[in-house]
Amino acid sequence: MSKSEQISHMTDVMAKFVGYTGKVLPDDVTAKLEDLHKKETSKLADVIFTTMIENQRLAKELDRPSCQDTGVIQFLVECGTNFPLIGELEALLREAVIKATVDSPLRHNSVETFDEYNTGKNVGKGTPTVFWEIIPNSDQCSIYTYMAGGGCSLPGKAMVLMPGAGYEGVTRFVLDVMTSYGLNACPPLLVGVGVATSVETAALLSKKALMRPIGSHNENERAASLEKMLEDGINKIGLGPQGMSGNTSVMGVNIENTARHPSTIGVAVNVGCWSHRKGHIVFDKDLNYTITSHSGVNF
């Protein structure tokens, strides 16, 4: 393919993939919702879970977005330095969002700040957001897609703790956020926690944590133990599906971390709602692609 044909091909695939993720949940989210439904003992929660699952069935059957809020589109990119379209990637992802907005369709969710007008295309200044990670000597491009809806974005919080607060302080911060804001974020939630030096590094890590598969664990045993502790603690709050009470509050807690300054503990929380619309696609140098988040999908 020529360069222009490559760009057109990848744009088309990404537009279709973005639209698809708004209609069909990833395999791990679907499986977790079904598992939580089976374990639920509250009659009201059972009805809500049944409605959630029926909603997803109809979204796929009718080829419509599963939630009216299709969010602001975000991409987390891990791109090799030898990938043929690395220089064109941001522009083509922008075009893919414009195309998906019409074809899927997606709700118009890009409002220019201060000027306060909706662009009508789901693109604007800095939108879609692209978070980059460059991989040396690789010719592949891994792209996580995410629909950041209003409800699941509202609980997002970050702060820097004094080191004396320790990991008890991290735990307290996460639980405070969940008890104060989790109710209205459409639970059961996937909770992403970032621990680093400052607010921006912790916040980005908490977003990356939401891309991890449900049921995965931090490679550090202490961090993995804290994931389980937080999951158990938040579940005991009993938010239940849609915040209407029940046995569970979350689908899981994922922690991502970096080394930190000895004088600070930066911590951030991001959450994904029950309709956690993430996707993961990997392109090789010939633009063949593999979708890992949704089985049996090809465009």
Where in the sequence are the language-model features?
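Non-transmembrane, aqueous-exposed alpha-helical and coiled segments at domain scale
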Residues: 1-299
